[in-house]
Amino acid sequence: SGKTTTLAAMLDHVNTFRRENIITIEDPIEYLHKDKKSTISQREVGMDVQMFSRGLRACLREDPDVILVGEMRDLDTIETALLAAETGHLVLSTLHTLDAPESINRIISVFAPHHQRQVRLQLSSILRAIISMRLVPRMDGQGRVPAVEVMITTPYIQECIAEKEKTGLIRDAIAAGVSQYGMQTFDQSIYQLYRDGYISFEQGMKYSTNSEAFKLRVMGIQSTLDIALEEMEKSMSKVERFEEGEGAKEE
C-alpha cells in the first residue's frame, strides 16, 4: 500500500538535509540508504535483531536522533516506541489501519483498560502526525495513484486524543484543517483526484469513506457535513487568531 516507500522517502529527506544519527529496524530491509548528512544504521529482524521490540530497546542505548520501526505489531513494540518518542527521539513507524482515528484507537486498545487513560494523555503529547494511504486504480489504466489522509496534531486534535468521548471528532477536525494546517481526509483527497482526472467516478465511490458525500460533491451539492465543516474551519481560525493575539500580549 506504499507505506514502506513513503517511510523510505521521509528517511531519505532527513538523511539529505539534517545531521542526525538514524537507526532503522525493518522486516525485511527493502531500501538501502547510504550516509549523506546523517549517519544511518539499518537492522533487519531475524538477521541483526530477534524482534522489533528488542531491537528498539537496544538502539535506545546508542543515542539515536531518529528511529524507524518498520511496523508496530505488538504491545511491547508500541510501548517502547511511545517511550522513545517521549524521551525526545523522532520515531517513524507503520500500522495496518484504515485511517488516523483507527490508528489512534489501535495504539490505545493494545493496552489494558486501566492503562488506557494514561496512554491517551501520553499519545496526545508526543504524536506529531499520521499519514494514511489508499492506492486507487488510475482511470488511464497506468497503475495506481495514492489517496492520502494527513492529520497534524493540532491543540484541538490533542484534546480529541486525550478525551475518549472526543475521538470521534478527529475526522471532522482533519477535514476542517485543510487551509490552516494543510490537513486532508481521504474523501477530500479522493475528490481532488477525481476532479484532476486521475480516477473515475466509480473508483471514487468505491474508495471514499463516505460515498454519498462524494456523490453530492461531484453533483455540486453541499452536504450538511460540508456546511458544518466550513463553519468548524471558521471557528478554528478564530480560535487560532485569538491564541496568537494572547501570546503576543504576553510577550
Please provide the spans of the model-predicted regions.
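Short, flexible helix-loop junctions that flank or precede catalytic/ligand sites
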Residues: 1-251
